[in-house]
Amino acid sequence: METIYQVFVSSTYADLKDERRQVSETLAKAGFVPAGMELFPAADQQQLEFIQRVIDRCDYYVVMVGGRYGSLADDRISFTEREYEYALSKGLPVLAFLHGSPEAIPVGKTDENRAKARKLKAFETGLQPDA
């Protein structure tokens, strides 16, 4: 019997909707089962618990980071970062995609809030292998 792997695809939503779709389609064409926020209603704390149950059933975790930090959970950490931390805690192999030219991201797809921009930068730094 052939093994089918499930991959959780994580990112902020509105600014990376097209990229998420492309990654999910590519994974599906390659024989993987993509899972991600498209399957879930709006984010809240119960949502995070549901997402964690989905991550528990996944074999891999992919995170894409653009110009936004994302919606904050109760502890003021983004849902995307919480998902990433959870995947790490479960020992899932993680593949992170960071925008190669963040300065070229259109203004409408970046955080205007300076506190969120700082959190995004710290999150990006933690995703890099030599960090």
Residue ranges and their predicted role:
Residues M1-M64, L88-K90:
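Conserved N-terminal substructure of TIR/SEFIR domains
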Residues A14, P41, R68-G70, S101-A104:
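Solvent-exposed loop/turn segments at secondary-structure junctions
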Residues D18, S71-A73, I105-V107:
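Extracytoplasmic/secreted cell-surface and envelope-processing proteins
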Residues V23, F50-I51, T80-E83, K119, ...:
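A general structural detector for well-ordered alpha-helical segments in enzyme core domains, enriched
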Residues A42-Q47, G67-S89:
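Conserved TIR/SEFIR loop-to-helix hotspot centered on a Trp-containing motif
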Residues S89-P102:
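A short helix->loop->beta-strand "cap" motif at the edges of active sites that frequently abuts
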Residues P102-A131:
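C-terminal interaction surface of TIR/SEFIR-family domains
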